[in-house]
UniProtKB/Swiss-Prot annotation:
GO terms for biological process: ATP synthesis coupled electron transport; electron transport coupled proton transport. This is NAD(P)H-quinone oxidoreductase chain 4, chloroplastic. It is found in: Plastid, Chloroplast thylakoid membrane. It is an enzyme of class 7 (translocase). It holds the Pfam family Proton_antipo_M. It comes from Acorus calamus (Sweet flag). The lineage of its organism: Eukaryota, Viridiplantae, Streptophyta, Embryophyta, Tracheophyta.
Length: 500
């Protein structure tokens, strides 16, 4: 057990520092912006220091773990702890949230509340990825809903209330199943609740009960991932949210569902996962095709990118369902890769739409001439998203491909069919992305308009874009650095639960 509460400080620091925003002097929004960015940077630097000097990569066990009694009547303990599975999402959270606060620079209305909500999300996300207690996991899962709902309903587009209501209904509805499963697992087999992951991992359940727990948790995660048909909140939410909120949604929120699927369903309910895995692979395969086809028909720029996110998350679902070292490592790599790419595409889409005051693709055209910097960055991230070799998207999807091909869970013919359908999805991806680029940037529609003047990307936008582009290239050239974070933990999960 860790003697110094590093993780508690990392989890609590953003939201506690965020409360001080309301006590800052009334001297304009600039003080609030710089204060929030400094808090996010300090948190990111603290994370990096702790993980570099106090975390052993070759140890698959929980590290930096803490255990403090909180609510004795429920045997509820504050139990943070990290391993190779959680370190990647935590660092991604710190990186994307810091850049999202910088992207939110133009927000001036109620900026104190806006930036506090972003810091509250920051704490909730890190708390979820570092929790090793079922009830703490659930509380952090729910803590995320309130800031997202307020950010949507107060700083969104014209249909923001509809989108925010749809978001809260879907996610809260999914959380009901999580709420039923957590005490069920904790109370089974003993009079006193056992909510920590280590005890639950050693607990055996009747197959029917394990399937019931698994299915309930799966519904909750399927909303956040999202898995079709529980995905319809996502395009509406992305279509109305401010682009800094979209960065957090696409970059981090979707990853919470996949993380829960691995951390709880795969690690704690292995027999049920083995039964459900073919259906997960089937759902992921259909999701790639369906979302890519639907994206091609979207005329709203943000909704097109939102459906591309749904399509790319299909690769993560396939990797998790493959039950192989390669497939699960590929799923984790795809999580991190899409975290960068999704955040970047929504940021660039938002800045572009702010400049031209248009959101529909059929009204755009010719923007590349007055805005060459945005055109260059948008094209580069689109190439990475369509899995261009040398970028993170290509490596992640290729590793998932190899994972499903080498899986012992499936016969030869089903594997051929799955890889064939995945290949079709990878062909559809460049079709809708290149079509989107053509509609926005090529032609002369807007360029020939009278009195048209569009300002190109400024230093702030360029800085955010380049900061995201560097890890995209880095992962594409040397993915082993990211894979080394999780490879030992992945082997431990699979060897302990499937190959014994």
């Amino acid at each position: 057990m860790s003697y110094f509460p590093w993780l508690t400080i990392i989890v609590v620091f953003p939201i506690s520092a965020g409360l001080s925003i309301f006590f800052l002097p009334h001297r304009g929004n600039k003080v609030v912006r710089w204060y929030t960015i400094c808090i996010c940077l300090l948190e990111l630097l603290l994370m990096t220091y702790v993980f570099c000097y106090h975390f052993q990569l070759n140890d698959p066990l929980i590290q930096l773990d803490e255990d403090y009694e909180w609510i004795n009547i429920f045997d509820f303990h504050w139990r943070p702890g990290i391993d190779g599975l959680s370190i990647g999402p935590i660092l991604l959270t710190g990186f994307i949230t810091t850049l999202a606060t910088l992207a939110a620079w133009p927000v001036t209305r109620d900026s104190r509340l806006f930036h506090f909500l972003m810091l509250a999300m920051y704490s909730g996300q890190i708390g979820l990825f570092s929790s090793r207690d079922l009830l703490l996991f659930f509380l952090m899962w729910e803590l995320e809903l309130i800031p997202v709902y307020l950010l949507l309903s107060m700083w969104g587009g014209k249909k923001r209330l509809y989108s925010a209501t749809k978001f809260i209904l879907y996610t809260a509805g999914g959380s009901v199943f999580l709420l039923m499963g957590v005490p069920g697992m904790g109370l089974y087999g003993s009079n006193e609740p056992t909510l920590n992951f280590e005890t639950s991992a050693n607990q055996s359940y009747p197959v029917s009960l394990e399937i019931l727990f698994y299915f309930g948790f799966l519904i909750a995660y399927a909303v956040k991932l999202p898995i079709i048909p529980l995905h319809t909140w996502l395009p509406d939410t992305h279509g109305e949210a401010h682009y800094s909120t979209c960065m957090l949604l696409a970059g981090i929120l979707l990853k919470m569902g996949a993380y829960g699927l691995v951390r709880i369903n795969m690690e704690l309910l292995p027999h049920a996962h083995s039964i459900f895995s073919p259906w997960l692979v089937l759902a992921g395969t259909l999701q790639i095709i369906y979302a890519a086809s639907t994206s091609l028909g979207q005329v709203n720029l943000k909704k097109r990118i939102a459906y591309s996110s749904v399509s790319h998350m299909g690769f993560t679902i396939i990797g998790i369902g493959s039950i192989t070292d390669t497939g699960l490592n590929g799923a984790i790599l795809q999580l991190l890769s899409h975290g960068f790419l999704g955040a970047a595409l929504f940021f660039l889409a938002g800045t572009s739409c702010d400049r031209i005051r248009l959101i529909y693709l059929d009204e755009m055209g010719g923007i590349s001439i007055p805005m060459p910097k945005i055109f260059t960055m948008f094209s580069s991230f689109s190439m990475a998203s369509l899995a261009l070799p040398g970028m993170s998207g290509f490596v992640a999807e290729a590793v998932v491909f190899f994972g499903i091909i080498t899986s012992q869970k499936f016969l030869f013919l089903p594997k051929i069919l799955i890889t064939f359908v995945m290949a079709i999805g990878m062909i559809l991806t460049p079709i809708y992305l290149l079509s989107m680029l053509r509609q926005i940037f090529y032609g002369y529609k807007l360029f020939n308009m009278t009195n048209s003047y569009f300002m190109d990307s400024g230093p702030r936008e360029l800085f955010v874009s380049i900061c995201i582009f560097l890890p995209v290239i880095g992962i594409g050239i040397y993915p082993d650095f990211v894979l080394s974070l999780s490879v030992d933990k992945v082997e431990a999960i699979l060897s302990n639960y499937f190959y014994r």
